Amino acid sequence: MKSSHAYLVCILLLSLFSLHQCVRLERSNKIDMSVCVHEICGGVFDGGCYCCPKTPALCWADIQFCTTYCQSQT
């Protein structure tokens, strides 16, 4: 009976350690969604354009204007 208790405690500790590692990994992998994404756009924007990730239909040729607009949307 004691060996089964030790086995369950061991499984619990391994599970808690795995969960702790996942939380640490998740915190370090946060993506900053306020930064504009460089896209290839045709027509007016020959060198490409910058779009907000949340609204990909709105794109601008100037990265500074896009960054200002994307930050105001959050």
UniProtKB/Swiss-Prot annotation:
The keyword Disulfide bond applies. InterPro entries: ESF1_brassicaceae. Pfam families: ESF1. Disulfide bonds join C36-C51, C41-C70, C49-C66, C52-C59. expressed in flowers. It comes from the Eukaryota. GO terms for biological process: suspensor development. Keywords: Disulfide bond, Signal. Residues 1-22 form the signal peptide. Belongs to the MEG family. This is EMBRYO SURROUNDING FACTOR 1-like protein 4. It comes from Arabidopsis thaliana (Mouse-ear cress).
